[in-house]
Amino acid sequence: MFKTLYSRIAIYAITVILFSALMSFLFTNIYYHFHLKASNDAKIMRTLKEAREYERTQKPKPLDTYLKHLGQMNYQIMTVNEHGTKHFYGETFRKNTISQSAIKKVLNGEDYHGIKNKPYAFFVTGFFDNETDNTVGIQFKTDDGALAVFMRPDIGETFSEFRIFLAVLITLLLIISISLVIASTYSIIKPVTALKNATTRIMKGDFSTPIKQTRHDEIGTLQSRFNTMRQNLGQVDQMRQHFVQNVSHEVKTPLTHLQRLLTQLELTQNEEEKQLCINEMFEITNQVSELTKELLLLSELDNASHLTFNDNVHLNTLIKDIIRHEQFRTDEKDLVMFTELEDLYFRGNERLLHQAFNNLIINAMNYAPQNSMINITLTSTNHLIIFNIENDGSIAEEDAKHIFDRFYKLSDESSSNGLGLAITQSIIHLHHGSITLTSDDKTQFIVKLFI
């Protein structure tokens, strides 16, 4: 029954309507029994006593005619004389349920309050009980002796047209309410169904179809955020495909080269050529090894929840150690290194920060022209550490836009795999810092870390 949200909401709403109607009836019934019943009894008793007083003072002849007249005025009347003979006036009672003891008490002059004392029942409204015990009774004195007179208003006659009106009203109320519930439920479910279908398309890899925002409530917000999510997932999927293609290319190229070298090694008889092949093979395996390490590091950075950033890193020492370790690169190109480093500490992940600064320094060494200078400064301002590395040579504007993209290379001849600066940017962002590039006559990377 509840396999769809549509049926669930519709049935819930209809159940609420019916339950509300039932509870309203029960509470109305309780209100009648505990509040209105005594008042109704007293009002009818007063009317009956006024009728008795009128009969006693005015002496309408005969009494039977007078009672018939009362019956025609929408009252139901039953009389019982001392011999137990009963007469009925007005609309006939549905049941004759009054007890003999009640009749005797009235004949003896005691008032009868059957309406007031009607037993309470949950699903029976005493006001409409057309029974002789649901009356008030008093004694009339006649020439033939005492006469017990029991009376109640003829509810059926009084409210016959109203009951038809009420029945039509309730029927129409239920029909219209249920119809509107079904229609409104459909209006709620329709965009949800559209979301479900769109989700199915996304599961199949289709990120191109947006859903129209048709509302301005919570569902409208959900539609808007779904479209945003769809776009983001599409971008992630494109990045994933691009990443797989790049990795495949970066791995396939050295493997193809390695296969060619193995074939050449197998065929050549020249020892010098064999050694050159072996040396080149070692270089290729080192490149693949570096690529693997950087891919693993990227994966670690993309899932950084396990990383800690509690090391007290001495940046001055860290940068000097990198420069000292890479001294051979400066010697190969006759580079001059100028450093101006403040004695600064920063709380973060020392291993990752070492990798980030190492990438920037090696990148400057690799792309600086022969016999040029590299300037490195480390300064601080209020709550900010600024690392600046500058080398001669510029980067084209189009290249600068993609310099931090994964696998982006400035030149196809470059031995780099294009991951170093992407890794550096990820590390700096994980430390809540920023990295920017400016390139005119010189190329300058600026890293800002908040203390």
Curated annotation (Swiss-Prot):
CDD domains (alphabetical)? HAMP, HATPase, HisKA
Q: Which GO terms describe its cellular component?
A: plasma membrane
Positions where Phosphohistidine occurs in the chain: H249
Write out the entry's keywords from A to Z.
ATP-binding, Cell membrane, Kinase, Membrane, Nucleotide-binding, Phosphoprotein, Transferase, Transmembrane, Transmembrane helix, Two-component regulatory system, Virulence
| Coiled-coil segments | none
Q: ATP-binding: is it a keyword of this entry?
A: yes
SUPFAM superfamilies in the cross-refs? ATPase domain of HSP90 chaperone/DNA topoisomerase II/histidine kinase (SSF55874), HAMP domain-like (SSF158472), Homodimeric domain of signal transducing histidine kinase (SSF47384)
Q: What is this protein called?
A: Heme sensor protein HssS
